[in-house]
Amino acid sequence: MIGETKLAQDFWELGRCPECPIYDMHGHMGVWHSIYFPRADTADMIRTMDECGVRMLLFSHHMALFAPDLGNTLAVEAVRRYPDRLRAYCAVNPNYPELLDADLAALDADPHHPLIPDVYLGLKFLADYHGIALSDERYRPAWQYADEHELLVLAHTWGGSPFDGPSVVRAMAEAYPRVKLLLGHSCHGEWDAAVQLARDFANIYLELTAVFDDRGVLEKLVREAGSDRLLFGTDLPWFDPHQAIGALLSAEISDEDRHNICHRNAERLLAPFLGMSGV
């Protein structure tokens, strides 16, 4: 189905819509082993964002996911270079507890140049890749810090995973109610469980990276969880925003739903950090 609403027509004709800015809440940056990304460096990613009206990207650097002492530094540099377009998640790898402690300490180290909110708006967990469940004690310092400071946590989640599947997510949402918990990929494949989590916890949001690939799932999430609990995301540079935007515009949902997903929900989450003035 080709979207024919006013909002869709603006995007088809102009490539973007000033009345509907897009906040991409799930991105990365930099090269990755065994795959070619045509636009993986910071400047090229900004160019991609410009082409399709992405106002801001929240990302974790690829290197930070496995070498946080190096990659988080690269994330800081990128945000300092484009402060109006980028914010980062501080990547947490519980396999290196000494680095985790150092990263958390650095967030508060310099009150004159605070990393929150000038660079970071939250933490990034990648439990499936790190082989350590979100509920593991080694994650506790990060969860506690995020809960105390009411930060965003973007957690990779996947259906059937013993590390970050729905049952593990539920336990963490119960334990840390002040965290704004963004479920990366929306517990991919276990859509009913993802819907139930969004219904049961006011602090849970379903992030849509890779959801757009499954026909009918977006409509299901809008219908059963509500568009006010969904967030636009792409995994840029893994997926091009144009594909996700096209799927969103062609889905059988309303323009009000699209506004919620593209910017309203993100603006509400980001407002305590950024005030949304000039963002």
Label each residue range with its predicted role.
Residues 1-25, 39-56, 227-229, 242-279:
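Mid-to-C-terminal alpha-helical segments outside catalytic/metal-binding sites
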Residues 3, 135-231:
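Catalytic pocket-lining loop regions of alpha/beta-barrel enzymes
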Residues 22-27, 57-59, 87-90, 121-125, ...:
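Hydrophobic faces of well-ordered beta-strands that scaffold small-molecule active sites
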Residues 26, 49, 75, 123, ...:
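Conserved, mostly hydrophobic/aromatic
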Residues 28-40:
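Acidic/histidine-rich helix-loop elements
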Residues 30-33, 64-67, 94-98, 160-165, ...:
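Active-site environment of divalent metal-dependent phosphoester hydrolases
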Residues 41-48, 71-78, 102-114, 138-142, ...:
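A general structural detector for well-ordered alpha-helical segments in enzyme core domains, enriched
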Residues 55-56, 66-154, 160, 200:
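Active-site gating/metal-coordination segments in enzymes
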